[in-house]
């Protein structure tokens, strides 16, 4: 029978956050990996430090920070400013914009490292949850397969029982027909014997008179 045990209650209400499509995963990666948290959001996730415990998980609340792509934005602005200064012939401003682009790229690299460190524990919890979820789905699939096999086995037993019942009925009818035929034959033989006995008696009487 399939297990009715739900997933950890600490994950209830946030399942959609973990079961993501490709676009959601891409968006989350872009937000988490290269960026440094600049503020706090009000979105709160309740995570279990030990997801395998499905009955009494202890919970802790983690506040996910709101992040922005400052390095990417600054790099883009520096390139746009450099392009405009080149068209305007302002070489000094062009040099400043290129230096700003280098600084922005350095900031982006630092943001990638810092963001990766910041989200490391969250990624571990996510992988742990995904492992539990995959194991739960595999278990449910296996139990459903076993249930289907059991249902087919019961159906096969029922069909076999019906065939045996029909065969017994047919054998019973054949036996009853045989008894009727035997009784009829016995009656015919008895009648023939009686007839022969009467004929013999009549013959004896006739021959006795002579």
UniProtKB/Swiss-Prot annotation:
The chain crosses the membrane at residues 66-82, 102-119. It comes from the Eukaryota. Residues 38-67, 152-192 are annotated as: Disordered. The keyword Mitochondrion applies. Residues 138-171 form a coiled coil. It is a multi-pass membrane protein. GO terms for biological process: mitochondrial respirasome assembly. Residues 157-172 have a biased composition (Basic and acidic residues). It is found in: Mitochondrion membrane. Keywords: Coiled coil, Membrane, Mitochondrion, Transmembrane, Transmembrane helix. InterPro entries: Hypoxia_induced_domain, RCF1. GO terms for cellular component: mitochondrial membrane; mitochondrion. Pfam families: HIG_1_N. Cytochrome c oxidase subunit which plays a role in assembly of respiratory supercomplexes. Associates with the respiratory chain complex III/complex IV supercomplex. Belongs to the RCF1 family. This is Respiratory supercomplex factor 1, mitochondrial. The lineage of its organism: Eukaryota, Fungi, Dikarya, Ascomycota, Pezizomycotina.
């Amino acid at each position: 029978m399939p297990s009715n045990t739900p997933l950890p209650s600490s994950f209830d209400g946030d399942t959609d956050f973990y079961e993501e499509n490709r676009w959601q995963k891409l968006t989350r990666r872009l937000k988490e990996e290269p960026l440094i948290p600049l503020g706090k959001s009000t979105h709160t996730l309740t995570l279990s430090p030990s997801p395998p415990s499905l009955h009494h998980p202890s919970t802790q609340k983690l506040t996910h920070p709101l992040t922005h792509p400052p390095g990417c934005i600054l790099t883009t602005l520096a390139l746009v400013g450099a392009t405009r200064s080149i068209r305007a012939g302002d070489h000094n401003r062009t040099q400043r914009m290129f230096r700003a682009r280098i600084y922005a790229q350095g900031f982006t690299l630092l943001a990638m490292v810092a963001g990766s460190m910041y989200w490391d524990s969250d990624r571990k919890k996510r992988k742990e949850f995904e492992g539990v979820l995959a194991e739960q789905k595999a278990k449910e699939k296996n139990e459903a397969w076993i249930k289907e096999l059991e249902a087919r086995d019961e159906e096969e037993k029922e069909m076999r029982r019906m065939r045996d019942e029909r065969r017994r009925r047919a054998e019973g009818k054949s036996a009853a027909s045989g008894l009727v035929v035997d009784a009829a034959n016995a009656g015919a033989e008895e009648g023939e014997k009686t007839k022969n006995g009467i004929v013999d008696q009549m013959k004896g009487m006739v021959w006795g008179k002579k």
